[in-house]
Amino acid sequence: MATETATLVTTFLSRSLVSFTGYALYTAFGKPSKELRDPFEEHED
């Protein structure tokens, strides 16, 4: 029973990490990236 629980927890954490990484990459480089603001371009001196 303990082995199954450990496997489920490990699988859940791994999938969560992969999902978060995929979402972060999509936000950074996908369609939503056009809506991100660039603070360096806003404050040119």
Swiss-Prot record:
Predominant location: plastid
Assigned keywords, A-Z: Chloroplast, Membrane, Plastid, Thylakoid, Transmembrane, Transmembrane helix
Disulfide bonding pattern of the chain: none
Membrane topology of the entry: Single-pass membrane protein
UniProt family annotation: Belongs to the PsbN family.
Known role: May play a role in photosystem I and II biogenesis.
Entry protein name: Protein PsbN
Biological source species: Adiantum capillus-veneris
Gene name per UniProt: psbN
